[in-house]
Design a protein with these regions (language model features):
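Short beta-strand-to-turn element immediately C-terminal to the catalytic PLP-Schiff-base lysine
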Residues: 32, 147-150, 174-175
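Residues that recognize and position ribonucleotide moieties
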Residues: 30, 105, 166, 172-173
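Conserved nucleotide-sugar donor-binding
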Residues: 101-102, 171-182
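A conserved hydrophobic position in a structured secondary element of the catalytic/binding core
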Residues: 59, 107, 174-175
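Short, flexible, basic/aromatic active-site loop/helix in glycosyltransferases
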Residues: 149-166
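Conserved beta-loop-beta/alpha segment of the NTase-like Rossmann-fold superfamily
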Residues: 65, 69-151
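N-terminal glycine-rich phosphate-binding loop and ensuing alpha1 helix
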Residues: 3-62
Length: 184
């Protein structure tokens, strides 16, 4: 289904968790199969006819620009949003405010989301959200019996090898342009 919204891709980070790979390449250009992770993410949005991409760059930005500009066969627009210093997600969103004036996606450049972007957009619109953060469900198991005690140290319960489920930020968002006013 066609949704055709602008997409802000966060490609300015150092990628310290991916070192030593990111000593050579920015994380956006790490290969996943035959393409870079950045191309994989762009392709996932192209399936929904999102054809306008704003890429927030800082670390090794020249490599990212050169690489994307060298792709001759792309049928989408790419605009670069320059972070002169590391600003983080909110800072990059604020910089993009001079280019974006409609509902838009924000995606980290180091995640691959296997979900229906049109359904996420429907949820966002039906909920009348200014910001929708897409969560991933994570599970942790503790391989021991966990003791629950009262304030005096008396045993109340033993939970044997409990499992916990929680939601984490997946790095994919939908925002309304009204959020720009909240960012200093």
């Amino acid at each position: 289904r066609k949704i055709n919204l602008p997409v802000l891709l966060m490609a300015g980070g150092i990628g310290s968790r991916l070192k030593p790979l990111t000593n050579v390449f920015p994380k956006a250009l790490i290969p996943i199969g035959e393409k870079t992770i950045l191309e994989q993410i762009i392709d996932s949005f192209l399936e929904y006819q999102c054809e306008k991409f704003y890429i927030s760059v800082n670390y090794k930005s020249d490599m990212i620009k050169y690489y994307l500009n060298s792709l001759n066969n792309h049928n989408y627009e790419v605009h670069f949003v320059e972070e002169k210093e590391f600003l983080g997600t909110a800072g990059s969103i604020k910089l993009a405010s001079e280019f974006i004036d409609s509902t838009f996606f924000v995606s980290n450049c180091d995640i691959l989301i296997d979900d229906d972007y049109a359904n996420i957009l429907d949820f966002h619109k039906e909920s009348k959200n200014e910001i929708t953060i897409v969560a991933a469900i994570m599970q942790s198991s503790i391989p021991y019996g966990v003791l629950e005690t009262n304030n005096e140290g008396q045993l109340i319960e033993i939970n044997e090898k409990p499992e916990y489920y929680y939601k984490i930020n997946s790095g994919l968002y939908i925002l309304e342009p009204s959020v720009f006013k909240y960012i200093p």
